[in-house]
């Protein structure tokens, strides 16, 4: 593709000479592992100047130890607005007179539990990170993106299209973020800023293990009646989801490739389905009547399909 730099992206040498076009720059949140880290490495290897945002100093050190040029780490905590503002100021200083060509909002968290037993504080935390924290990042970095007429790429989920049992917290937060993305896309269109949504299916990442690894702790806090009603079903859904991710999920590098496409395409799509099963799942959600989709989901997870019978 042909890349047209923003007017502020050229720099004159100290003595008369040819114009130098700086590398394109991008901020990737949640860069310590999984999709975020794969995207950081892919873009850096293709010459981008990559700002890899992580929560902890140890995570920054681990990225630096990978020894890949073009990567600059920055500390950014989606749950802390001051941290986000500080990161924005730091990156603005590092960029100098240049803007930010790309923003990939990738960081997020998951939670599996029946709606009846969702701890309100934990549900709020999921939305704080997956929705409000993402909005904080967009608001903090949009002036830099606007300066470069860059792009905003948001990481959603194929669960935007359907909600598995016990995934209400994650799916609802991702659906909310998809709506925010759609509104932002329309609002920034006249400003020449593309906004895209990536919708991965099952991906083999540490985030899946982290979500599933704490299930027994979650179950242990339920009242006895809830354990009888939900515990075995939740374990079954979790085990199938883990197996799907572990054995049939796409590598994070496959999603990173789609992110790069969204950043570089001349006319990027509004949404990109990413991964082995994302297209199939989205098409099923689009085509099947909701009651049939419910039955298909229940059968996939081996749960009872007869109404009123467990």
Language-model segments: residues:
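Conserved glycine-rich cofactor-binding loop
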Residues: 32-33
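Active-site helix of classical SDR
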Residues: 138, 173-176
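Substrate-binding pocket helix/loop in short-chain dehydrogenase/reductase
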Residues: 114-115, 122-124
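The beta1-alpha1 cofactor-binding region of Rossmann-like NAD(H)/NADP(H)-dependent oxidoreductases
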Residues: 76-89, 120
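C-terminal beta-strand-loop-alpha-helix "lid" module of Rossmann-like NAD(P)-dependent dehydrogenases
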Residues: 190-245
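Residue(s) in the substrate-gating loop at a strand-loop-helix junction
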Residues: 157
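Active-site loop immediately N-terminal to the catalytic Tyr-X3-Lys motif
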Residues: 116, 162-169
